[in-house]
Amino acid sequence: MDEKMVSLRINDIPVTVPEGSTVLEAARSAGFNIPSLCFLKDINEIGACRICVVEVKGAKSLVASCVYPVAEGMEVYTNTERVRKSRQLTLELILSNHRMDCLTCSRNSHCELLQLAGDLGIDAVRYANDNMPPQIEASAPHLVRDNSKCVLCRRCTAVCRKTQEVGVIGPNDRGFHTHIGCAFDRDLAEVDCVSCGQCIVACPTGALSEKDDTARVLAALNDPAKHVVVGPAPSIRVTLGECFGLPIGTNVEGKMVTALRRLGFDKVFDVDTAADFTILEEGTEFLSRLNGGGTLPLITSCSPGWVRYLEQHAPDMLHNISSCKSPQQMFGSLVKTYYAEQAGMDPQDIFVVSIMPCTAKKYEVLREEQRLPNGCMPVDVSLTTRELGRMITQAGLLFEHLPDGAFDPMLGVSTGAAAIFGASGGVMEAALRTVVEQLTGAGMAPLEYKEVRGMEGVKEASYELPGKTVRVCVASGLHNVKRVLDGIRDGSLQYDFVEFMACPGGCINGGGQPIQHANVRNFTDIKALRAAALYRQDEGMTYRRSHENPVVQKVYADFLGEPGSHKAHALLHCSYIKQKRYRV
């Protein structure tokens, strides 16, 4: 059926757009940029900030273009004197309630409010509040909130409520006393936050940021008694370049490795290698449950945001989750056991740093359930992509001009299956590549499972295997995870294997990834561009199934025994428990 179109005029230019489009979308298609602040497409469409106002012929007042629908014959004006003065006054009033320490703010190079001030010609703030003190709340291990920089756009509350259905933050009080916080102004550490960090990447200012752990890493690098090992997650190599202005989806693996060496890390390993171990362990666990009558569906445990959601909001499903540690934790476990043994080092002298797309990893590294038999915690510090970007900049490295380097081979060889872990469906596809081949025989299984790829919130597929049908599901974003969980509970959804990721689109869209301007987010499929880069990497890999990785084979032969062995369970598995929820 043909889509119905609507014709209108914008600044006297004829424009034709699909029915249901907003004035903002129509203007964009015609080459007119309408500034906005509170608008995030499909997430926060409330027209509250009034920055995006335009004139519509016949309307009594200016209208918010982000929510105002087009109509046949409409005449719109986006740059009249009335519009410009309204936007400037609105922005001045917003700035009057904003602590402007722009020189030292964590968002000083990519603040939407700062950019708006320049774009709208604000050369003086007539109503500045020069004495506004910081309002810091830093109780959680992953996030710092400073409400003195909050502009009440409600983008953070919308993503927490709608995308994640966690809803731990919202507006408190009324009028001039309105502020964003938790119920009864509780600290974030006291409520049911899952640490996903989606609120941070939604925030247009410096009101929300990850807790910066770079000082701890620099201290370790400067400590001659510490042997400092680093490992980046699969998605980092296709997002780090954005910190330096490279196009979205640029793979910078080689430059990233060189940068890490020049920062002073003693060994640069790859968490992709640990992802291959994850598939061997999780695949073995799945086959054991499938063939031995264990609890199904088996649900993946790679996403700490999802795991925390499970423990707080769905503890009745704890028996379904895999006991495997995440790739980050497996990486640290192998470094402080296998690598320490091979290098003849005391594990206590090894300082492990992970580079992750995820703020929830900062919470995960603190979990006592992860502690190794030798008394060590697997990972000492988890940094986000953004933190690594800042370290590279502060070290004076010209990232774009760095030569390509290679990972240290002992724990630095990986497969295409590990590379795609960073995209929603990647863990499932990686597992299927190994599990299906084990069930059907070498050379009989397909290499790609495109049914589980893509940015849809929920994906389903079934595969006919010898003697059984395997039904799988992939869901990302906790709103979609909740839907699938409800279906599993009531029996309307029947699966054998399920992949859950807390962040929409998976790790490529994690809360620790580079923050893109709302104009980019609203009109570009960032998740798809980043994921496509991972699939391109997969296609070019020598090994594309996790069990083909020669490093994995060697570590099992020389150290772990076999997948699912007693030693593997002691080092690469853990338990998850019901967590206390704050009740209001």
Predicted regions and their residues:
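Mobile "lid/hinge" segments at catalytic clefts and subdomain interfaces of large enzymes
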Residues: G167, I200, L388-I392
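Structural motif corresponding to the C-terminal cap of alpha-helices
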Residues: Q164, C203, Y339-A343
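Iron-sulfur-associated redox domains of electron-transfer enzymes in respiratory
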Residues: S7, P14-V83, E210-V584
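Phosphate/diphosphate-binding loops
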Residues: G197-D212, R261
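Fe-S ferredoxin-like electron-transfer domains
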Residues: R50-S195, L208-D223, H227
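Terminal leader/tail segments of proteins
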Residues: M1-E3
